[in-house]
């Protein structure tokens, strides 16, 4: 391990704490929005300190300008336009744009994978079936 590099176990703990803080922010938002904003800020600080990426599912849940936790319909507006998902923060008015292409590709890939696995199981069933004489292939 070179000098200044953190051990893997430390990075794993940081990732777990980030996830816990975002889940707590999500739970706490309806009762106490300021506390959820603080949880988001703490999670972001941990990510910066340990140089760990915030998971994609949570990256879109806080404002990049004011760092407040975003709850669609409560303090942010979500719109889809021109192949992008637009999040508008009601706290500061900042608009974040994320490309919609990745979601489309993931959905298309999952559809193709589920279709090929269904066909693959059908082929396996027909291959192991009995032949015309009523004997299985192992009886020959």
From Swiss-Prot:
Q: What is this protein called?
A: Ribonuclease P protein component 4
Complexes and interactors: Consists of a catalytic RNA component and at least 4-5 protein subunits.
Enumerate the Pfam families for this protein. Answer: Rpr2 (PF04032)
Q: Which cofactor does it need?
A: Zn(2+)
Keyword flag Ribonucleoprotein: no
The job of this chain, per UniProt, is described as: Part of ribonuclease P, a protein complex that generates mature tRNA molecules by cleaving their 5'-ends.
Q: Which gene encodes it?
A: rnp4
> How is its cofactor bound, per UniProt?
Binds 1 zinc ion per subunit.
Query: Catalysed reaction per UniProt?
Result: Endonucleolytic cleavage of RNA, removing 5'-extranucleotides from tRNA precursor
Family statement: Belongs to the eukaryotic/archaeal RNase P protein component 4 family.
